[in-house]
């Protein structure tokens, strides 16, 4: 079921227009949520994902990018967005290894349901990384990809916030 949903939602996401305005609105919502936190992992956007990199501009916060190796995510400190490498799954990350304790993780998604579960790309990286972590978990999707479909499985991790360009949903 997830494989077919992923395909349908990716097609839908690829056809979304006015991305720049939507991305800007998403960033405004995220900035309000992360205001009191200092160590935040964000995702370098691929394909048609929302681009939230503008939240790092002029910020005094510490940002990190996920480095995906084999089956795991390793947070890497982001010192300079112009000095990146590609990880094992060909996504941009940082070279700088760190043991810093993250406070917030902002994850991408193909889609998200209103039960606060994300539909990722099928690798389980974020589910394994976030398992048993006491951390603020934010998933970012365009509003068109927020669904009522109950697709989560027992190993899926639920998120604390869903951020779209139209609203912020907080899990109670």
Provide a role label for each language-model segment.
Residues 71-77, 117-119, 168:
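Short, well-ordered strand-loop elements centered on a beta-strand within folded domains, enriched
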Residues 57, 120-126:
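Charged helix-capping and loop-helix junction motifs
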